Amino acid sequence: MSSTISLKPTHLILSSFSTGKVLQFRRSRFSHTPSSSSSRYRTLVAQLGFRPDSFDFIKDHAENLLYTIADAAVSSSETFESVAGTTTKTTQSNDWFSGIANYMETILKVLKDGLSTVHVPYSYGFAIILLTVLVKAATFPLTKKQVESAMAMKSLTPQIKAIQERYAGDQEKIQLETARLYKLAGINPLAGCLPTLATIPVWIGLYRALSNVADEGLLTEGFFWIPSLAGPTTVAARQNGSGISWLFPFIEGHPPLGWPDTLAYLVLPLLLVFSQYLSIQIMQSSQSNDPAMKSSQAVTKLLPLMIGYFALSVPSGLSLYWLTNNILSTAQQVWLQKYGGAKNPVEKFTNLVTKEDKTQQIEKSFSEPLVQKSVSELKIPREKGGEKVTPECPKPGERFRLLKEQEAKRRREKEERQKAEAALSNQNTDKAHEQDEKSDTAIVAEDDKKTELSAVDETSDGTVAVNGKPSIQKDETTNGTFGIGHDTEQQHSHETEKR
């Protein structure tokens, strides 16, 4: 690199056109100062989050946003200005992104030399892929932290919605209760933004490194079907407004590069569009219940086409980096969200009573005056004398403690009630057994009685017959002995008299 020369503003670099009309158009449409850029970004976020059907906004600002990202990433690389047919070469500025870009460029060259030493074909292409994998692995802990924070925030969405409905119109109260909820859950709402912000300098540095290598003419070798990783265009050509001049206009029915090379260069942007579309479909299916994801589906459908268009105006080495990064990012998100790679830090946080249905059930079952008072005061402020009177809130943690005590009391009452029901059931069972035993005894006695009655029949002359035959009657005689039946005794006396 030569000595450092301060760069002109980015909007002047973008406005190097041959005609004044186009120059004025580019300056007014794509210029961006720091103040206007931050305002544009805030507007873009608001549009993406709350108005997904804003097609006019996307049409007017999509290309502007893409050029802004590209210029921010390569503003310190070698750029060219076309002034009266001459080209002036500028160098990197001494911003802190340049240091990262220099390190990335050095690592890329070391990887390329190492692969060339072991005679690996397409060494620069594989060096780009390997460098992307290394950077992705280095930033993986931050990505995991960001996904876990997003999962935690998604888990608390019902509680936050209940707080917003309960204190509707009182933004200060909503913020206070939401902050208390975050504190009880032990999460930081900014934890999901910080990892993403931390990875931005790394990826911008990598982008600049690849741009510098392409501008230095080091990516002249091909990669499988790609004729050259430095083609079909350059960053400087895109900045001059001729990024897709290799496609149009046709010359005698043929593109400027000819059909074979043109089709070969088109394969990589098409793969990038397909991979981006597939990534969006996978992520939307994994977040199908996320309201924020549903509201941005209309915008994300256009994202693959915008990225594909942008890939047409940069060297193929950058497109190869985007494709590799997109595949790795999709694989990371799928593993973290679908296969348990990331753990929800608030998964066990189930003791918060902030959902509307649970709150209503608890409020209806409260019987203590103190709890009734605290709940009613927290729910809505009373009006007295035409003025809105907001009662004092209980001490921090007081309401939660009362709720826990009430819940424990109801649990004890439920257990006692279950024990009483079990004892009553056992008592009823014992009584039923006793009644069954009594009824069985009565039935047996009745059967015995019927048997005796059927076996014993009285005759008409006063004798007792057993089974229809005369039986011996047990009579006590005057001398205390037992005699024979009356008929037998008379027969014996007659026989004695005859003798």
UniProtKB/Swiss-Prot annotation:
Biased amino acid composition, Basic and acidic residues: 379-420, 430-452, 486-499
Q: Which GO BP annotation is one of this protein's?
A: chloroplast organization
| Coiled coil, from the record | 397-436
Taxonomy, superkingdom: Eukaryota
Question: Which compartment or compartments is the protein found in?
Answer: Plastid, Chloroplast thylakoid membrane
Keywords in UniProt for this one? Chloroplast, Coiled coil, Membrane, Plastid, Thylakoid, Transit peptide, Transmembrane, Transmembrane helix
Which GO molecular function annotations are given, in alphabetical order? membrane insertase activity
The UniProt disruption phenotype note reads: No visible macroscopic phenotype under normal growth condtions. Increased number of plastoglobules (lipid bodies) in chloroplasts.
Tell me yes or no: is Coiled coil among this UniProt entry's keywords. yes
> Where is it made, tissue-wise?
Highly expressed in green tissues.
GO CC entries: chloroplast; chloroplast thylakoid membrane; thylakoid
The family assignment reads:
Belongs to the OXA1/ALB3/YidC (TC 2.A.9.2) family.
Protein name per UniProt: ALBINO3-like protein 1, chloroplastic
Q: Which organism is it from?
A: Arabidopsis thaliana
Q: Which gene encodes it?
A: ALB4
